Design a protein with these regions (language model features):
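Conserved P-loop NTPase "ATPase switch" module shared by AAA+ and STAND
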Residues: 72-74, 79-102
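P-loop NTPase Walker A phosphate-binding motif
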Residues: 51-66
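Conserved small helical "lid"/interfacial subdomain of P-loop NTPases
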Residues: 131-154
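Short, hydrophobic beta-strand segments that form beta-sheet elements in well-ordered domains
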Residues: 68-72, 89-92, 113-120
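Amphipathic alpha-helical "lid/sensor" segments that cap RecA-like P-loop NTPase cores
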Residues: 152-182
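Walker A/P-loop nucleotide-binding motif
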Residues: 37-55
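Sensor-1/coupling segment of RecA-like P-loop NTPase cores
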Residues: 96-134
Length: 182
């Protein structure tokens, strides 16, 4: 299969919107975020959708008049108070910062427009907004949407083999699709 035809190619995966479960909606999360004082964390294991939800919710908040500054901790420099003025700090991979740098960033965000962060474990310094979880029905739905076909019969085993990491599972399915000849 040509890479451009692979249903698991990056450009297709990047267009997937995070799917809230249990009847929740982005408006519900936005209201809860406001109720937490505009400071909260999204948690989940590797490949559970934290970064996707972080970006989706930040986009949603921007449409509601909440401008943001987005950083990937450990890669991007820490923003100054001037850069943060009136903006929500959206920090992906917050747990990549040392304790000292994290405290400094939280203090700046607290004096600016708040903070929305993605982390792997429940933080002591931010309230929990949402816990990203993965289950087979969610992943099966994503695979069906990407391929237009039923998921492979071994999907549950593959998800387990990848410890629930959907990103790693999609890389595996990309390789599997690439190995098929037309």
């Amino acid at each position: 299969m040509r890479p451009a035809d692979n249903p698991f190619r990056t450009e297709r995966i990047d267009r997937i919107q995070y799917r809230l479960t249990g009847g929740a909606a982005l408006d519900d999360l936005a209201e809860r975020f406001a109720g937490l004082g505009g400071r909260a964390a999204i948690i989940g294991h590797h490949g559970a959708g934290k970064s996707r939800l972080l970006a989706t919710l930040a986009d949603h908040l921007e449409t509601r008049g909440r401008p943001s500054l987005r950083i990937r901790c450990g890669r991007d420099p820490l923003p100054s108070l001037e850069e943060l003025a009136g903006r929500l700090l959206v920090a992906d991979e917050l747990d990549h910062l040392s304790r000292r740098r994290r405290r400094r960033l939280l203090a700046r965000a607290g004096r600016a427009g708040g903070m929305l962060a993605a982390v792997h474990q429940i933080p002591r310094d931010l309230p929990l907004l949402h816990h990203c979880t993965v289950d087979i029905s969610l992943v099966a739905g994503l695979v069906c949407d990407l391929t237009g076909a039923p998921p492979p019969p071994d999907l549950a085993r593959l998800l387990g083999d990848h410890a629930g990491n959907v990103r790693a599972l999609f890389r595996h399915l990309y390789d599997r699709a690439a190995d098929r000849t037309p």
